[in-house]
Amino acid sequence: MHPISIITGRIVALPAHDIDTDQIIPARYLKVTDKSGLAEGLFYAWRFDAEGKPNPDFVLNRPEAQGATILVAGRNFGCGSSREHAPWALQGYGFKAVISPSFADIFRNNALKNGLLTVQTDEETWQQLVSLFEEDPTTEVIIDLATQTVTLPDGRQARFPIDPFTKHCLLQGIDQMGFLLNEEDAISAYESAHPPRVVTTARS
């Protein structure tokens, strides 16, 4: 994982609500454990037609959407079955963050643990972002993890929630295992200071 501090990038809006993980990445792509190549399957049923040709009407296939790194998605994004391949596919495509009024809990947890920032905003900010993209597809926003803010082109800022432990891990670019490894000395010191068996008054 790479440290996340400030993400500055163009947005692309996919405002449909209740986009589930099967729509994000079809089940046939779940047979692999290698993250490479999963970008091909991202929103496959929408990006391609029945013959496998790109659908020119889908937003990600439009020229103005190329290079966007921040996805603005509808409510309850990532609902459905749990699959780490969903955030992997989004990252493989080039997305560094997803902004939505709400996320499915399992998707949000999987995304954050894999270094994909999920930004939950209020409805007003979300609607403004969707409108900005429709008016100007080159719109850029700034996401500051340290201050937990999203800055819009007009300077307006909106805060987003994130738990302190996850925030720390993302800022440091480590996962839960990496955090434990960083605390190895403290863990060893604790174990050395405590007996392997807890003394009680209970009879064996």
UniProtKB/Swiss-Prot annotation:
Q: What is its EC number?
A: 4.2.1.33
CDD domains assigned = IPMI_Swivel
Please write the reaction equations for the catalytic activity of this protein.
(2R,3S)-3-isopropylmalate = (2S)-2-isopropylmalate
Its protein name is 3-isopropylmalate dehydratase small subunit
InterPro entries from the entry? 3-IsopropMal_deHydase_ssu, Aconitase/3IPM_dehydase_swvl, AconitaseA/IPMdHydase_ssu_swvl, IPMI_Swivel, LeuD
CC annotations in GO: 3-isopropylmalate dehydratase complex
PANTHER family, alphabetically?
Answer: 3-ISOPROPYLMALATE DEHYDRATASE SMALL SUBUNIT, 3-ISOPROPYLMALATE DEHYDRATASE SMALL SUBUNIT 2-RELATED-RELATED
Record bears the keyword RNA-binding: no
Biological role: Catalyzes the isomerization between 2-isopropylmalate and 3-isopropylmalate, via the formation of 2-isopropylmaleate.
One of its GO biological process terms is: L-leucine biosynthetic process
**Which UniProt key words apply to this protein?**
Amino-acid biosynthesis, Branched-chain amino acid biosynthesis, Leucine biosynthesis, Lyase
The family classification in the record reads: Belongs to the LeuD family. LeuD type 1 subfamily.
Q: How does it assemble?
A: Heterodimer of LeuC and LeuD.
Pathway(s) of this molecule = Amino-acid biosynthesis; L-leucine biosynthesis; L-leucine from 3-methyl-2-oxobutanoate: step 2/4
* Species in which this protein is naturally found: Roseiflexus castenholzii (strain DSM 13941 / HLO8)
Q: Name one GO molecular function term.
A: 3-isopropylmalate dehydratase activity
